[in-house]
Amino acid sequence: GDNYPPKNMYIKLIRNKPKGNAITGRLIVDDGQLTLDTLEPWQYAIPAGCYRLRLTYSPAFQEILPILDGVLGYARQPHNGIRRTGIRIHAGNTIADSRGCILVGSIDMGDKARLLSSRKALNELREYLLNYQKEYPNEEIYIEITEPDAYPLYDVPYECQLQKP
């Protein structure tokens, strides 16, 4: 089809500096078509870097959820030296709801370590990604995670493109 040049989708997760044990951030999907707030637990957070994102069924959550695939981390090793696997994006309100997974929602302005409307945010994200996959079945989705002190932000995550599987 007229599906060229390849329309790989890029998602950016721009992390803020950790406050206590919480890392907040912004998830910018497809050049800002969708933006969501994120929350991660610092001690389990995966390294900054570039990952392929897939949508698979999660037996634990009993729903289709994004999963980060292919650990192409740089700039920072996992805190405990353990390679993180099974990292998903899912709903939740505080870091107690995550063992390294990325929670999405809207930051509670009264309590920055808390997400509101998380289920709604997850549904929006999943719907956007599923529609994209339907429209571009042969393309990949990449997520680049950046940190303020770890790596410069690029408009186009060049590492992602270099390391295509």
Regions found by a protein language model. Give the residues of each.
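Cell wall/extracellular polymer interaction/catalysis modules
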Residues: 4-141, 147-152, 158
